[in-house]
Amino acid sequence: METPTGSGRPSRMATPRLSERKRQLFGSPRSRLRQINDDEDDADVDSLGVLPLKTHVAANRKGRSLFAAVPGKSSSSANSSPETNKENKKTRGGVMTATAEQLPQLFTATMRLNSNSSSNSRNSSPRQTRVQRKRADSSMSSPTSSSEGTPSSRARNSIRRSPRTFSAQKDPDAFSSPESFQTRLSKVAAMLMKGQDSRSMLEKSKKKHNHSLKTTAQVHTTKPKKTSPAEESQSDDEKPSSSKNSRKNTEVRETRSSQIISPKTRNRRRPFTSADINCKTLKAAAHLHENMRSYDEEKTAAVKLENSRSRSKSPVEVFKSNDDAVKRNTGNTNNKTAKSSEVATAKRPESPGSSMKIDVEVPESDEEASNHKPQKRQHPETSTPVAPSADADSGSPQSKMRKVTLSSSIPTMAFYSHSGEAVTKSRRRPSISKNSLKQPTKISPTSRPLLGINKGVHHKIRKRHGFANRLPATDMDNILNSLSNERLKNLITTKREERAKVEEVHQILRNAKDPIKMAKPLSVIEADDANNNNNLPATAWQETSADFSDLSDVEDIDPIIEVEPIIPIIRHEPVQKSPTAEPADLSKRKFFKSGRRSSTCMEVRITDNIRASVSQGKIELVQTIRRKPRQVRVKSATIFSAEQATVDAILKNLDDTVVDEIVEANPVVQATPIDAEETTMETESLPDIIEYAPEANDVEIDPFAEFRQRLPYQTDDPNVVEQQQILLEFLISNNICTEKNFEIFIANPDDYKDEANQIVDNLYMVVNSEEAAQLAQMETVENTAVAIAPKQDAPAVEEVQPKLFPIFTQRLQPVVQKSLRRRPDTSMRLLTAAGGSNQYQIDAGQKAFGARQCQQCGLVYTVHEPEEELLHREYHNSIHVLRFKGWIDEDIVSVYPEWASDGRIIRINERAPTARLDRLRDLIGVVDKELGYSSYIVPKIFVAFIAVRKQQIVGFCLVQPLSQAHRFIQVDGTDYFSEESYPASCGVSRIWVSPLQRRSGIASKLLRVVQCHTVLGQEIARECIAFSTPTDDGRALARQFTGLDNFLTYDQ
């Protein structure tokens, strides 16, 4: 606050309020930011009577005083000193003298004071909101405010008045007193007569208003400053029209913070400024009234447009209709009536002389509308806004909070991508056209489709398009011509051809819409120009791959390096002899069959007896060479028993298997089963046998044919004829078909029965005695000597037998071959042994019968026998006894890690704890059930050995001391003991191994432990260990361990 010049008093500083001092000393950073002001804004703080904590230069504030040269000028403030209040009371009712230049400012200040004198009556207005009444009461009860109120508070209260009570709430002195009204009119007329044109003043104020609009736009784009409560409570009577631009910025901030009006009271409240009083007062001057009305109508139309924009929900529509609506409103301004102008002004007035700006700036003309930047969108508030009032000056808690205004807030839609771009564009561009808003957002790259999972995610990596086209084509012909190495050139040429073929196949499959239709040989497709790879350009194969958007960028950048899977070219070496290839019908080609005619015959073994060959693209089963039908059958054995003694003797001495092999008509043609590896070798050597065999047969066919022509021999009986044919084939097959043998077997069999039996017996004995020699000679004797048949008698045949039967004797006796069947496991052998060779049960269709081995306990028992099933049930239920988790102080005598990690043998004797002895008795009970012992006899002195594997008892041996035993004797399957006694060291009472763990050497290891750890410090000889009543398996174990058939045994 400044003391008027010439008052004669010393300058006095007002004491700051306690809340203001607390805010300055202990305020938060947010409250400190409100104290940051420009140097030009210091006068606003002085008008409140509050001095900030910085140096105040009074010399720089001379130009800010309205009546600096008048000694009687004083400012009316609620925070001034008592002397100043007395002076104000003296000068308030007096006449102030001023010069002509100061007359307009004097008139304006006077009208403001008179119009604001009725602020007390406004507080009791029935149309006020609850928040306004509360603020008015707080301002009235402020300890630093006077009963009349400060001019700034009255000015602010006048802004919030309802439009309906505008004329009723005016100062009655301003309109009721005709003297004051005439005096003011005379002063205005004197001002106009002296040459001060009001039009020039309007233009000047108009320019100032435009400048404030630009400054307001700058406030929007820059970061809004946080104003202090001192600036918000500045009075209007200290706002001269010649203030600086910084002063206008402060006024803009005041207006934005003071005019936050809720949507419900937006239409009822009206910003009422001193400029509106000037408009009403200057209606007496006709030409001035016309100028003001035209200007108000223009501003009112723009304000109505902005009101409709602020209430609209779509910000895009406001921007679209911005230019057109402003033009239409500007053109229709002069045609509106005064009544519509007053009604529109009552809603939201704006005058050129007013320094209070509303939220939405209105451009003056089309040029200004296109020059200044559009404002931020106005969002209607859902909650009741807190407008600044007089309680902010009184240090209320609301004044300590930051003033949140629409201008300084960020809209919620700015956090989203679709609305963030619109906001930034509206800030950067001065005007937005319809075409720019309708353009869709460009997404890069454009060729990539928007996938669902990556929708909205973009990156700045760009693909390199056309990289393959920029590379120079490689001329392979020039490179090959420049090579001097012929071997390398041929290799490259061959590889190029193979690669071309492979690429041709891939190109055909890529271009084919239906791959099944295109699965033809290359020779058929080669003539098709559309699919011929040779007609394509050199670089076409590089671009054949489809542009998949989900592939990596590396594949798109360098498609030349992309290596496709190469189809291997398989070359087969042709064999010497192959079947002729028939011309293939291309129209009847099967799926994916090539046109290459291969002479390779591949053979695959499917099973032991089934083989398949692949030739000419077809797979066929290899047919085994069929034997000729046997002419000697078993049923003929009973036919000749009554009629011919010779045939009866022959069939009596021959086995069924011998008959099956002997009676083959032409065994030379037969081929034995061979492995797949020997197929090629046998196939090549087979033609020699086929070529030479008929020649040998041709030599011997003549006598055999002669014998066949004799049949039937002296009979017409069909049964006898059949017998003669069978006997002749028997003689021919054994190469003993001579005249003498023909007479003995066919012509006169009744007279030569003894000779026939002798011949058959000799033949059978020779085969049995010379079997080894004949098997060795099969591989060494030449094939040409096969067909030679000696014409000798029986003794001669007996001498040359090794030479007469090199091959045919192979089929007389079955050759011992290695069995192809796998060896049966232990369970199968147990089942076979349990079943036996005799049938004790009748198979009447039961689901299961016979011997069975339990998979859990390993016991073999007979199904559907009550005794066997009961035994198995008891043994199976007692299997838990075999579970052994170990003891604390075990007497481990041997460790076997090959069994398991815990494989060991434990020793226990009769001096063990009671719990261990009870566990031993349970174990002996389980063992005796399987061994067949009737009573569980435990000796008084004993040593037991337990084999443990994987926390399971798998073996058990119970040893007792023994001094003498008997020898084991077995006669005709019956076990006997010798009467003599022999010395013994110990006796094995029981030795048992789990059925599932047998045949793994556990019993032998138990006996070895008995030999070494039964007697302390002494190893017992194996011959001195006796066994008690062994079973069949125990007998075999004892013989194997002791090496004696008559081992020691005893009866306990």
Curated annotation (Swiss-Prot):
Top-rank taxon: Eukaryota
> Where are stretches of biased composition, namely Basic and acidic residues?
290-309
Q: Which GO terms describe its biological process?
A: mitotic sister chromatid cohesion
Comp. bias intervals (Low complexity) = 114-125, 138-153
Residue limits of the N-acetyltransferase domain? Answer: 906-1052
| Phenotype on disruption | Flies display disrupt centromeric sister chromatid cohesion very early in division. This failure of sister chromatid cohesion does not require separase and is correlated with a failure of the cohesin component Scc1 to accumulate in centromeric regions.
Residue list for modification Phosphoserine: S176, S177, S310, S312, S314
Keywords of the record = Acyltransferase, Cell cycle, Metal-binding, Nucleus, Phosphoprotein, Transferase, Zinc, Zinc-finger
Q: What is the protein's species of origin?
A: Drosophila melanogaster (Fruit fly)
Q: Which family does it belong to?
A: Belongs to the acetyltransferase family. ECO subfamily.
Protein's UniProt name: N-acetyltransferase eco
Which lineage do the record's taxonomy fields give for this organism? Answer: Eukaryota, Metazoa, Ecdysozoa, Arthropoda, Hexapoda
Q: What EC number(s) does its UniProt record assign?
A: 2.3.1.-
Q: Which SUPFAM superfamilies match?
A: Acyl-CoA N-acyltransferases (Nat)
